[in-house]
Amino acid sequence: FTEIKNRLIETSEPIQSLRRKIISMGRVSAYNAFHNIKKAYPEPDESKWKEIPQTIESEHPYRDNTDQLFTLHQAGAKFMRVRFEKLEFESDNDFLTVETKEGDIVSFYTGTSHPSGATSDYIVGDTAVVHLVTDHSVTRYGFKVGHIEVID
């Protein structure tokens, strides 16, 4: 059983949005498992991240019934992540996601217990989308992005 389990994990197809959610970091592939095809997930080198000033922010406090997209782009970036100066939302009802331009969620935030300087998970590519969704009651500060981090 252990051998089969390990083979399924090692030969899964990498999926960015599953990277920190499941042990295989992707979708099981019977074809890959049968042929023992192992796919490497592109992990960026921590020492290569560069800070680029880019400021975007919600209204403070944000409004009720908001569904707002903010796009961050850095031409030529291979990897990108978002660094927040502040994050504060109504728990469970209002939230913010960081997504790829295709809409895959890489980070999710709700509530008020986020440290100053929180950083999203990375995105493979040069574009990140910050998506703010709020309900009809209770508002908080919202968010402020101070800069992005990229690897060229």
Question: Where are the model-predicted features located?
Answer:
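C-terminal subdomain of the subtilisin-like protease fold in secreted/lumenal serine endopeptidases
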Residues: 1-48
